[in-house]
Amino acid sequence: MAHKKAGGSTRNGRDSNPKMLGVKRFGGERVLAGNIIVRQRGTHYRPGENMGMGRDHTLYALIEGKVKFTRKGPKKRNFVSIEPLEESQP
């Protein structure tokens, strides 16, 4: 004879691993070519000057410089660009 009531089952208990999305380098920060600026799903931020976009919509720097976030166009879309660093004169 059972001394414990049979336990029910649950349909919960699952969770997905974190995807580490978001802005990785903020406006004004100095970056190197190849640095990831934004990891995202879809194109919340769009690539501006001197930026590349990976097939998963990751934005990365194509040159060394400073990160700049802007809003452009009639729909005020977010663009991320890289401003080249001024070369110091010897």
Curated annotation (Swiss-Prot):
Organism, as annotated: Coxiella burnetii (strain RSA 493 / Nine Mile phase I)
SUPFAM superfamilies: Ribosomal L27 protein-like
Family matches, as Pfam families: Ribosomal_L27
Keyword match ATP-binding: no
InterPro entries: Ribosomal_bL27, Ribosomal_bL27_CS
GO CC annotations, alphabetized: cytosolic large ribosomal subunit
PANTHER family listed in its UniProt record: LARGE RIBOSOMAL SUBUNIT PROTEIN BL27M, RIBOSOMAL PROTEIN L27
One function term, GO molecular function aspect: structural constituent of ribosome
Alphabetical GO biological process terms: translation
Region (Disordered): 1-22
Keyword set includes Magnesium: no
Homology family: Belongs to the bacterial ribosomal protein bL27 family.
Keywords carried by this UniProt record: Ribonucleoprotein, Ribosomal protein
Protein name in the entry: Large ribosomal subunit protein bL27
Gene3D superfamilies per UniProt: 2.40.50.100
UniProt lineage: Bacteria, Pseudomonadati, Pseudomonadota, Gammaproteobacteria, Legionellales
